[in-house]
């Protein structure tokens, strides 16, 4: 029998452990009584052959009869059909009755190999089995996920919606080179507009520390310092809003290289996308709210400077702040911090006004004469200018004054007063 390992000839048995480890053919001599290979006999060591699985052709399976049920016109009867070669009488069944020995041992012997050579790579089957199990596990996990998605607790719907709103893609300095979807920018602008509206109402109705606005400090931790533990100041809040608005406007602004470098490596569409009316109006409203908040802050700061200058020993008088540049002290000046704050805010608003492309009478900062500042901004085109003028004219009174234009003018006046104080 081909599958019986004990009845095989000694010279056809499996290779010994030494030949199998070295992946060599194990030659055996039938004349010796000992069951040792020629290589072990020559070396004078004990030839050990581990028990291996039986090789050869597996025994044929017993053919089970199949039951065929036929339905007639009047009655149904069951016929038992034997699928054996003699019962069917088909030529396809008789073709399998060949007398050739197609066992694996004979094939391997004809090409100079043994079945034991493949036993070293039995771990390949072990490596393949986790792949199939992982696929079945993945299908099972998908089925469980579908069942869990169908049975959602209604109490978690509100929390899930708020998490999706809070996990919107933010525009930071790290991903500024990536394209931003216009609907995401519009939604982020709406959220920023809501924050600025709440801050504008709070700064008008609630008291805040005016003296802390003029305090200059040197932060050694850098930009990544966590300010959540300390009390939030209105100046810090509006400064963060300016930074966020500048990043959002950078995502909406069409790059200047889109028309001059069509064959660059970065993706630049041939036709730049048109801005929506809602995007332009929300961005303009955010800018006006920021200007209004800065106008309130600087008016309070100017009143504080007037009160401290009139009363030298007043309750608001603080010790002079000494600054050092290159190790040399700067003479103390009460209005130095106010002037530095004015220049800082002018530079911050200049970046936003440049991205928006506002005309001169809508700007707080001065526009450079030798540059084409604002021509590539959001309101730089003719259609955007028409929309800007139409939106401004809707709020004008009979005298041609407008609250938005008035807040821009008021901020410019109070900043000039602080500079000349």
Swiss-Prot record:
UniProt note: phenotype after gene disruption: Abolishes the expression of FUB1, FUB3 and FUB8, and impairs the production of fusaric acid.
GO process annotations (BP): nitrogen catabolite activation of transcription from RNA polymerase II promoter
Family matches, as InterPro entries: Carb_Metab_Trans_Reg, Zn2-C6_fun-type_DNA-bd_sf, Zn2Cys6_DnaBD
Induction: Expression is positively regulated by the secondary metabolism regulator LAE1.
Cross-referenced Gene3D superfamilies: Zn(2)-C6 fungal-type DNA-binding domain (4.10.240.10)
Biotechnology: Fusaric acid is phytotoxic to plants such as cotton and banana. It has been shown to induce programmed cell death in plants. In addition to a mild toxicity to animals, fusaric acid exhibits acanthamoebicidal, antioomycete, and antimycobacterial activities.
Keywords assigned by UniProt, alphabetized: Nucleus
Compositional bias per record (Low complexity), positions renumbered to this chain: 74-86
Protein name per its UniProtKB record: Fusaric acid cluster transcription factor FUB10
Organism taxonomic ancestry: Eukaryota, Fungi, Dikarya, Ascomycota, Pezizomycotina
């Amino acid at each position: 029998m081909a599958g019986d390992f004990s009845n095989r000839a000694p010279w056809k048995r499996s290779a010994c452990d030494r030949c199998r480890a070295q992946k060599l053919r194990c030659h055996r001599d039938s004349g010796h009584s000992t069951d040792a290979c020629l290589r072990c006999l020559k070396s004078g060591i004990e030839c050990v052959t581990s028990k291996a699985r039986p090789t050869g052709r597996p025994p044929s399976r017993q053919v089970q009869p199949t039951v065929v049920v036929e339905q007639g016109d009047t009655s149904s009867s069951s016929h038992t059909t034997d699928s054996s070669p003699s019962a069917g009488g088909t030529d396809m069944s008789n073709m399998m009755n060949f007398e050739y020995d197609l066992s694996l041992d004979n094939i391997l012997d004809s090409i100079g190999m043994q079945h034991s050579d493949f036993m070293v790579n039995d771990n390949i089957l072990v490596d393949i089995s986790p792949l199939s199990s992982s696929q079945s596990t993945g299908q099972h996990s998908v089925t469980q996920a579908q069942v869990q998605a169908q049975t959602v607790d209604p109490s978690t719907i509100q929390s899930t919606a708020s998490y999706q709103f809070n996990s919107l893609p933010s525009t930071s300095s790290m991903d500024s080179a990536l394209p931003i979807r216009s609907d995401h920018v519009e939604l982020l602008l709406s959220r920023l507009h809501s924050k600025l509206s709440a801050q504008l109402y709070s700064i008008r109705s609630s008291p805040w520390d005016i003296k802390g606005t003029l305090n200059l400090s040197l932060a050694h931790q850098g930009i990544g310092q966590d300010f959540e533990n300390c009390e939030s100041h209105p100046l810090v809040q509006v400064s963060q809003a300016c930074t966020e608005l500048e990043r959002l406007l950078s995502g909406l602004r069409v790059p200047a290289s889109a028309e001059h470098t069509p064959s660059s490596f970065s993706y630049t569409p041939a036709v730049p996308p048109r801005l929506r009316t809602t995007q332009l109006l929300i961005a303009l409203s955010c800018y006006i709210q920021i200007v209004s908040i800065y106008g309130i802050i600087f008016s309070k700061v100017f009143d504080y400077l007037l009160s401290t200058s009139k009363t030298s020993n007043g309750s608001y008088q603080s010790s002079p702040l000494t600054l050092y540049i290159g190790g040399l002290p700067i003479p103390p000046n009460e209005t130095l911090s106010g002037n530095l704050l004015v220049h800082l805010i002018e530079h911050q608003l200049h970046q936003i006004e440049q991205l928006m492309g506002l005309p001169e009478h809508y700007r707080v900062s001065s526009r450079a004469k030798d540059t084409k500042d604002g021509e590539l901004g959001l309101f730089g085109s003719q259609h955007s200018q028409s929309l800007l003028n139409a939106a401004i004219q809707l709020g004008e009174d009979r005298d041609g004054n407008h609250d938005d234009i008035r807040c821009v003018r008021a901020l410019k006046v109070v900043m000039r007063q602080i500079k000349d104080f």
